[in-house]
């Protein structure tokens, strides 16, 4: 048996990113500064949004959004069972209560009927998750929250301005995806993105938040609120304080420390230059996979439809009729051949943290059935066409061996 060396998701870093980081290191300004501001401006151009705030993670971006919205004790936020913990843990960080809903049968998206049923007078936000870069059905989500406006009770300035449950998209996987011709970022009320090392677009660690144009929002004031929350509650960042006579500042809230550095932003600036071609390569690999698995028991989530186009972050497959044990055996056998696979994700109610909060997987049968048969294959821009063929052939062979034709 031949042993390969195909990692799951290594970063794609060129000499361009390296040189840009060196330039920043030599510039004398390495924390939040001109390159972070430039990345924010360019990301807003890319997503067709009024402003972007870059932070040190998508998790921070999501939590700060809940804070800016004034969500806290006594409030409820709805999240799907099929997501990573970050989508949910931030709700507890903010002092609110998570309401976890099941996904729809034979789907990765939340059950929108269950979403409607879960909205109460205490609901302040819903966090849809664009899993694998595949946009949720935002028309349906907005239809649901609009239909429940009569229940909504605002208790903060931005809640008043929205006048309904906020749609706060976890777009960690979805930078570059589109929904009905609109870039993700300009669809939900607020959208957070991840720039973690394994993401399509990386700053090593990092993330951002943006929002769609809203006539009730003062974009500069909203941007300033995020800045204050992200830097200890301080009214000026380090760059602003360097201006002559500008040392004076105030601390207006006991805030966080989650700003992005110019070193990280330097990576992002070059990544953004390269991003269109990186997305093209991902689409090409997805097409090769789809063709290779035709006529087998292996099915994949669809990255394109009449209403959306995914940025192709993950290639998520389901192996028809596989048991939990067989799924594990397939992943081990792939690893023995040097091909790294993953699972996205364990449903939240299967995790100890959420079991301890009273969630029971028996109440989430669709999420569990989705999870049991799921295997994620390598999908990254350092894969060669030859390696894609190797993955296809070995995966098909192992699935047939373990589960049958």
Regions found by a protein language model. Give the residues of each.
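PLP-dependent aminotransferase class I/II
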Residues: 37-41, 49-50, 125-129, 134, ...
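Hydrophobic/aromatic ligand-binding patch that stacks against planar heteroaromatic rings
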Residues: 89-91, 183, 263
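Conserved active-site segment immediately N-terminal to the catalytic lysine
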Residues: 155-202, 247-251, 299
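Structural detector of well-ordered beta-strand residues that form the stable sheet scaffold
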Residues: 53, 78, 99, 166-168, ...
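Phosphate-binding glycine-rich loop
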Residues: 29-76, 90-92, 100, 149-153
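N-terminal "arm"/small-domain region of PLP-dependent enzymes with the aminotransferase-like
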Residues: 1-29, 34, 250-252, 378
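PLP-dependent aminotransferase-like
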Residues: 67, 71-171, 178
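Active-site PLP attachment segment
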Residues: 173, 186-236, 262
